[in-house]
Amino acid sequence: MSEEAPRSEFRLKKRARMNVQMRSGLDFSLENPADGRFKELDCVKRLLADHPQRVSKVVTSYCNHGYDYRKRTLFITTLPNFDPLPPCPLHKCHWKRRGERHPNQVVGASQAEKNSLPPLLIDLLIDSWRKRRVASKYLLLDVFSGWGSIEKRVREQQARGQWLNVYVHSNDLVKRGHTHCNLDMQKWTPAAQLFFAVNKLWPEKVEEASSHPGGVVDWLAASDVTVLVHASTPCETYSLNGLGVHRYRGGVKPKSEAARNADHMNEHLVSYLRASVLV
């Protein structure tokens, strides 16, 4: 964890770390390649099965949102109005409608591009969230921010006078120029990132937030701040390219230490989201 410790009245005590009870105003979106094994994790299947009215699985493709290669991706989300175009070729992109091939393939993209959401898809995600929740401020926790595509898109839109009340707090295990903290989500949860976000964005409110009887989530709700926890979870052990190394043939069962660690982290994350959002 590279973020400097907050001031004394805002320490991450064990009670605060474990205080995951949910109140109103939180949503989540999980994202991973649609053709990989992430969706087959027991914790993900149970999440969808236990909350069919509250959690949706949405599949789309990058080529329907401005990129010149297909890459199918899926979202597991509580945003009922998040409705991107179906994946190509189910909904043909403009190249396929002209009877052409996609100009490029994901394997030819840069590492940064491969690990970034298309700007138009980010627009749809954030606009759906803002239409679902009416609030004075919108706090997006980018739990696995990678190369910072969400933070970059928000800055671009704000330069155009849009989304001026949207705040992004970026976490990633790898420290980059856009990251605000570097929490290992095998050991922490987004609850800790919420504390860091308040400390970063509204430092004059940290004492008030930390002393709120309902914890920081209730303080945010009382302050008319709504939260979206977005997690584009690392896909290396779930994507088709890595299955031979990380998973036993034909299923999601892990055979590498990296895969076991990824499964543990995602189970930990989903457990937090179930407890904090879906009560």
Positions of predicted regions on the chain:
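Conserved active-site and SAM-binding loop architecture
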Residues: M1-V279
